[in-house]
Amino acid sequence: MSYQLVIAEKPSVARSIAGVIGADKKQDGYMVGNGYLVSWCVGHLLELAQPEAYKEQYAKWRYEDLPILPENWKYEVPKDKKTQLALLCRLMKDKRVDSVVCATDAGREGELIFRLVYEYAGCKKPMERLWISSMEDAAIREGFDHLHPGSDYDKLYDAAVCRAGADWLIGINATRLFSVLYGVTLNVGRVMSPTLALLVPVSYTHLTLPTIRL
């Protein structure tokens, strides 16, 4: 019997989907039934590696090493997520699985979460996209009746990779630069720093009032 592997973004969503499509038999890390295997990520299972993964010397924050500009991105697996990632890789390679459904959240970040796992596993099996904005049973059924080709969302994945890379480049380099220059850890980020500038556009106003003796 062949199966379609469905990968959600989190366990609660996977359970909701499984209940609708009939995957009602619980296994270790996934559910099976009615021609489906339903499993899940736990947020990001792969994260951009820290600078020292590119060169050992980057473990120490030095002005001379800036800017740090990786030619190719490297990814790391958080220790607490290795088991689930290994399971997803095994399911993708399972000979009974003939296609995969990306059922992560309908958005840029959800696309990134799934695609990184799909690529890490070296999966070449056909991939479709479940794109829904509601977790109501009717919406899930409608979504599975109208799955989209995975390639329709290639540009969304590219945008997510660019966003993550921009955050890394600005966050790593700017944080190290200002921290080294001022001798104290100063966190700088692509979103955080402009937001702070909007909230506090100039230095606080200092008022000097003369004292009057009565």
Regions flagged by a language model, labelled:
Residues 1-164, 168:
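Intrinsically disordered, low-complexity regulatory segments
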Residues 44, 192, 206:
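Histidine-centered active-site/metal-ligand motif
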Residues 114, 118, 196, 200-203:
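Short, amphipathic alpha-helical segments that act as regulatory/interfacial helices
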Residues 153-160, 177-184, 213:
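Short coil/turn segments at secondary-structure boundaries
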Residues 162, 166-170, 191-196:
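Short amphipathic alpha-helical "interface-anchor" segments enriched in bulky aromatics
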Residues 176-201:
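Charge-patterned, long linear interaction tracts outside catalytic cores
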Residues 205-211:
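Conserved small/polar residues in nucleotide/adenosyl-binding loops
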